[in-house]
């Protein structure tokens, strides 16, 4: 057997706390990946070494500078265990030990020749031959990193010392050619490690190994607290923080704490506004390279992760996992405040901010604060009007790619999520979950002013603005203000006249998809929502809720001018226009003005003569559905109350 002299210390790199702080987040990630992979190579090739402290810390995603070195007379206990103490002596300046050539080959493949320090040119040529698997009896002798002089490649890793390997693309310097080669694959796009299951390729072997566990389903790391299993030790360690609540790293800007320093570094870029990673397709900037890679999949439309239940495809594995929980109903993350459960930890974290009221992200334009950064980014589009994602079917633009994807399913007609209660289909799992609350009648969010309850927190926020009078969304065309951004968007289509949603039955067009859906029920006669008090059916859940207040007699909305009370807020708004005399909707044909938009629409049919609603009994046509319903009473003999 051909042997060479390599120890774990030969391929290990140590950092002080000061040196570690000099590294960028992607450099720290690369360091973790390479160190863990090299250690796994040594173990897989038969090296019986005890686990070094630095490996334990890296597996726990802690900082490697936290290693406490203990000076002992036995400097290499792991190598003595494998090869005997007589071959590894503290008095031996070379700190030599013979290792199989396969070990040296594996290490050199990962780290490059610069990982080792040779005492003369002859030894370098011998090592070069060993790298190429040349046959022969080569006794390689290499000096441990702990014996290296300060001019060696190991010393050059410290952030303020020499880094001889420069990337010609971006000018970044590296201490070893192997690190430069790995870095260059970012620019070249080279991904030599390909998954045979789904064809996905990776730059690093350790990334490939992690990915394969998604297909095999292997989850060897189990949480002792709750029994949940994970494919990677790092995932288990992150999960443990849920139980311990430990967050050591605090942001000095806003006081937010994190359980990992890398998360703190990422968070700090939000305050600094630094976004060094730019998409060449659309110019969008990101503060992390990983976010850029995720974003680029939007342009390539790559979706390698497919659901075995319904065939739906996703860009990212976590999206597939989240989607699968819709089929299984699994919700492992529960809120201790209200007992609500969630499919993802991120959703639980978002939900918990409802109870704490924390809103650290503030809009510089209008001062509005948000609990999540992505909510702030969405809000900013109201001020900028930016909508980079356009539908090729109808030309409609969106400010988020996810909104475009949702919209495209309208044209495709795909509705893979079906309600088991009533059979209604949805194009998104989130919409199905929202719909199911109609059947369960769950309403956990209660208004403190009037005790009105809501299914969703966003509904409570919108409702609260009725009491406060807050209307932050203003139309730039007519100055009208709204308490919801979606209401402003709906209103703006009045000025543009855009009606992209057309009924295939009668050709009638609508501004909103919701209006088209409601209209289509006129043709089908579908009324899935039944009142348990009187048995009356309704096309929409909101109509049923309005109807229920007839039985309860509750009228929470009172006019401050005259004291008249109403069951619905929209009825109060209509009534208030009697006092103000406001009539913003004017007919272009004759100049007549109306208080309500629906009054204008009715009036315009006098000019057009349009009568799309026909009685199936006698063939008589009407301009409004209410007129048709009144007419039907003639045939049925029913007297309207």
Swiss-Prot record:
Taxonomic superkingdom: Eukaryota
One cellular component (GO) term of this entry: nucleus
Residue span, KRAB domain: 6-77
Keyword set, alphabetical order: DNA-binding, Metal-binding, Nucleus, Repeat, Transcription, Transcription regulation, Zinc, Zinc-finger
Main location, first listed in the record: nucleus
Gene Ontology molecular function, alphabetical: DNA-binding transcription factor activity, RNA polymerase II-specific; RNA polymerase II cis-regulatory region sequence-specific DNA binding; zinc ion binding
Compartment annotation: Nucleus
Keyword Transcription included in the entry's annotation: yes
GO biological process: regulation of transcription by RNA polymerase II
Role according to the record: May be involved in transcriptional regulation.
Family the entry assigns: Belongs to the krueppel C2H2-type zinc-finger protein family.
Protein name: Zinc finger protein 780A
Native source species: Homo sapiens
């Amino acid at each position: 057997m051909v042997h060479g002299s390599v120890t774990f210390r030969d391929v290990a790199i140590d950092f002080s706390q000061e040196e570690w702080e000099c590294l960028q987040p992607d450099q720290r990630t690369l360091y973790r990946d390479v160190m863990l992979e090299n250690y796994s190579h040594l173990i897989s090739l038969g090296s019986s070494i005890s686990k070094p402290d630095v490996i334990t810390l890296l597996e726990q995603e802690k900082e490697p500078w936290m290693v406490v070195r203990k000076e002992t007379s036995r400097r290499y206990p792991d190598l003595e265990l494998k090869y005997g103490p007589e071959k590894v002596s503290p008095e031996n300046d070379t700190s030599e030990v013979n290792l199989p050539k396969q070990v040296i080959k594996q290490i050199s493949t990962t780290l490059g020749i610069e990982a080792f320090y040779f005492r003369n040119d002859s030894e370098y040529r011998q090592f070069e031959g060993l790298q190429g698997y040349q046959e022969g009896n080569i006794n390689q002798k290499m000096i441990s990193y702990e014996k290296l002089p300060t001019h060696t490649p190991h010393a050059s890793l410290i952030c303020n010392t020499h880094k001889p390997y420069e990337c010609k693309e971006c000018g970044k310097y590296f201490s070893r050619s192997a690190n430069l080669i790995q870095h260059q694959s970012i620019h070249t796009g080279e991904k030599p490690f390909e998954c045979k299951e789904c064809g996905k390729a990776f730059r690093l072997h350790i990334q490939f190994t992690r990915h394969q566990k998604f297909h095999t389903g292997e989850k060897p790391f189990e949480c002792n607290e709750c029994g949940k299993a994970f494919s990677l030790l790092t995932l288990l360690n992150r999960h443990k923080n849920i139980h311990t609540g430990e967050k050591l790293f605090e942001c000095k800007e806003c006081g937010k704490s994190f359980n990992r320093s890398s998360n703190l570094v990422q968070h700090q870029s939000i305050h600094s506004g630094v976004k060094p990673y730019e998409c060449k397709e659309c110019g969008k900037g990101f503060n992390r390279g990983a976010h850029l890679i995720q974003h680029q999949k939007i342009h390539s439309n790559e979706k390698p992760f497919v659901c075995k239940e319904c065939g739906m495809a996703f860009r990212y594995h976590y999206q597939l996992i989240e989607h699968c929980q819709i089929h299984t109903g699994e919700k492992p993350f529960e809120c201790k405040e209200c007992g609500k459960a969630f499919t993802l930890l991120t959703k639980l974290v978002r939900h918990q901010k409802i109870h704490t009221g924390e809103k650290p992200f503030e809009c510089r334009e209008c001062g509005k604060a948000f609990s999540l950064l992505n909510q702030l980014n969405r809000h900013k589009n109201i001020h900028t009007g930016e909508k980079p994602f356009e539908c090729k079917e109808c030309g409609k633009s969106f400010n988020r790619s996810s909104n475009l994807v949702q919209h495209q399913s309208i044209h495709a007609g795909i509705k893979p999520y079906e309600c088991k209660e009533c059979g209604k289909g949805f194009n998104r799992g989130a919409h199905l979950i929202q719909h199911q609350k109609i059947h369960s009648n769950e309403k956990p969010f209660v208004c403190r002013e009037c005790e009105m309850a809501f299914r969703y927190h966003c509904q409570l926020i919108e409702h609260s603005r009725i009491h406060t009078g807050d209307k932050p969304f203003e139309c730039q065309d007519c100055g009208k203000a709204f308490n919801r951004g979606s209401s402003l968007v709906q209103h703006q289509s009045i000025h543009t006249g855009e009606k992209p949603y057309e009924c295939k039955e009668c050709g009638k067009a609508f501004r909103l998809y919701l209006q088209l859906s409601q209209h289509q029920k006129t043709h089908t006669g579908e009324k899935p929502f039944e009142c348990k008090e009187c048995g009356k059916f309704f096309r929409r859940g909101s109509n049923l809720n309005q109807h229920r207040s007839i039985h309860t007699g509750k009228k929470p909305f009172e006019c401050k001018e005259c004291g008249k009370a109403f069951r619905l807020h929209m009825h109060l708004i209509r009534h208030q226009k009697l006092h103000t005399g406001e009539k913003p909707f004017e007919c272009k044909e004759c100049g007549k003005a109306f208080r309500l938009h629906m009054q204008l629409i009715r009036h315009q049919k006098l000019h057009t003569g349009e009568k799309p609603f026909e009685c199936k009994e006698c063939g008589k046509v009407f301009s409004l559905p209410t007129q048709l319903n009144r007419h039907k009473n003639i045939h049925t003999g029913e007297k309207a109350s």
